């Protein structure tokens, strides 16, 4: 029986051998299809391929956000410790690569640490990684960090700083947070 790492390697090789650009793969993945673990793993391999081939950053960011819109939980929940280790390393690598151009990578990395298993959970990463995402202009993190600062969640409370950050928000997320 093949290991998860071997199966993922085969998926990656098949995607690369297709000769199609990553953007051609993106539309076939939907929230419904990503509930299936095999589809999610394939989508992660497509995301890596997009990063390897320098696909358009906005398209890659949007695809990354889609595959990590809670669908990763369906994949990792049944993994044993060895499989989880591979999953963790792969997810962290992809988050790091996306974080080079998008705050979405930093925010997802922080979220992964806050939800991790097998001794990897570490809440101390959540706020700093979200703050990096906010500093990169990732709208969801900008609003979240403002709120956390104001309330003192995951960081030292600083109402003044929270209010300053709220006042600077211009995104639709700011409206959701009650600006």
Residue ranges and their predicted role:
Residues 50, 98, 132-133, 169:
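Canonical positions in the second alpha-helix
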């Amino acid at each position: 029986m093949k290991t998860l790492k071997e199966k993922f390697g085969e998926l990656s090789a098949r995607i690369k051998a297709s000769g199609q650009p990553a953007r051609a793969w993106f539309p076939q993945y939907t929230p419904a299809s990503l509930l299936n673990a095999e589809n999610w793993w394939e989508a992660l391999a497509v995301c890596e391929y997009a990063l390897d081939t320098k696909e358009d950053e906005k398209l890659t960011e949007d695809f990354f956000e889609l595959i990590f819109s809670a669908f990763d939980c369906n994949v990792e929940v049944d993994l044993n410790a060895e499989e989880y280790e591979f999953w963790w390393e792969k997810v962290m690598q992809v988050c790091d690569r996306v974080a080079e151009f998008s705050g979405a990578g930093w925010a997802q990395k922080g979220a992964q640490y806050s939800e991790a298993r097998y001794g990897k959970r570490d809440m101390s990463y959540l706020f700093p990684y979200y703050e990096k995402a906010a500093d990169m202009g990732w709208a969801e993190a900008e609003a979240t960090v403002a709120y956390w600062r104001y309330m003192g969640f995951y960081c030292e409370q600083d109402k003044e700083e929270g209010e300053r950050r709220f006042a600077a928000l211009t995104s639709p997320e700011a409206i959701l947070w009650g600006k």
